[in-house]
């Protein structure tokens, strides 16, 4: 029948963790004044500033208000309580809309999701301890189209050959793919944070009807609409890594009692990795006039 150690059975462990993430607190921003350089200058749907007239008074704006005589009411008739936004008309919607406040930050930032799964097999038998496992992590970021996927494998073996000799090895491998959001001049979060409170960043289509290469945004076209970016562009980082070590240990019997011992150990290890990066900008990206695939 053998010893008890010989009868140890393999142990299989499976674990999964799931979690969700939301932005717990957003910074306060003014939602009184509309897009424009100043109150006296009036509403300006091309301005990068949000110090125009009060949102509640947009219907009375001399140039765009539906309560006023201007080029838009001359064409479409009076629109009491509304104002005209040329960006809506460019997107194929009615240019006339009722002033209201939108949560552009909350609309853009979604719910993140994280999943971690581990499967492990281990056993101790005849002086050999081993453990092998695989794991997976998947994450969807709170910023649309961002996330991570990682697969990994691990092996560990320790072998007590006899009272004097021990050997073993460990090896780890991982493959990680990360899709991230751009920063600096190509950043999208600065566009989300700076969106005028009365501009429906989510609801207004991000490109002209039938022409996805012509973006629509509340400010100049040198900035990318974050929803357009999430649909068309990608920043990818892929890393493969392997590392581990092996050892051989000798402990001679010196016959000097338990308080004295000598161990001689030789060990070698490795750590290798490769990383590749891909930047994909489709035709219509504002940072370049042409589409770009950079690897």
Can you annotate each of these PLM segments?
Residues 15-17, 133-135, 170-172, 265-269:
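Transmembrane beta-strands of outer-membrane beta-barrel proteins
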Residues 127-130, 164-167, 255-256:
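Repeated loop/turn-to-beta-strand initiation elements of outer-membrane beta-barrel proteins
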Residues 4-144, 182-185, 231-236, 247-251, ...:
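Residues embedded in well-ordered regular secondary structure
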């Amino acid at each position: 029948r053998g010893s008890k150690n010989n009868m140890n059975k393999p142990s299989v462990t499976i674990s999964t963790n799931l979690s969700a993430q939301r932005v717990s607190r957003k910074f306060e921003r003014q939602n009184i004044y509309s897009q424009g350089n100043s109150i006296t200058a009036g509403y300006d749907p091309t301005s990068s500033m949000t110090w125009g007239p009060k949102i509640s008074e947009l219907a009375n704006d001399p140039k765009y208000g539906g309560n006023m005589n201007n080029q838009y009411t001359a064409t479409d008739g009076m629109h009491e309580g509304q104002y005209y936004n040329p960006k809506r008309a460019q997107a194929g919607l009615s240019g006339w809309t009722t002033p209201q406040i939108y949560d552009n930050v909350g609309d853009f930032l979604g719910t993140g999701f994280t999943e971690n799964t581990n499967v492990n097999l281990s056993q101790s038998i005849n002086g050999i301890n081993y453990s092998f496992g695989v794991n997976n992590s998947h994450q969807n970021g709170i910023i649309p189209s961002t996330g991570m996927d990682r697969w990994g494998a691990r092996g560990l073996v320790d072998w007590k050959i006899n009272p004097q000799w021990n050997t073993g090895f460990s090896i780890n491998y991982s493959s990680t793919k990360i899709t991230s959001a751009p920063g600096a001049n190509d950043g999208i979060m600065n566009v989300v944070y700076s969106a005028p409170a009365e501009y429906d960043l989510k609801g207004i289509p991000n490109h002209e009807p039938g022409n996805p290469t012509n973006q629509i945004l509340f400010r100049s076209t040198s900035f990318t609409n974050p929803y357009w970016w999430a649909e068309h562009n990608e920043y990818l980082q892929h890393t493969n890594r392997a590392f581990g070590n092996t050892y051989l240990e000798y402990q001679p019997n010196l016959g000097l009692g338990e308080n004295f011992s000598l161990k001689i150990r030789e060990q070698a290890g490795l750590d290798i990795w490769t990383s590749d990066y891909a930047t994909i900008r489709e035709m219509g990206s504002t940072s370049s006039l042409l589409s770009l695939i950079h690897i």
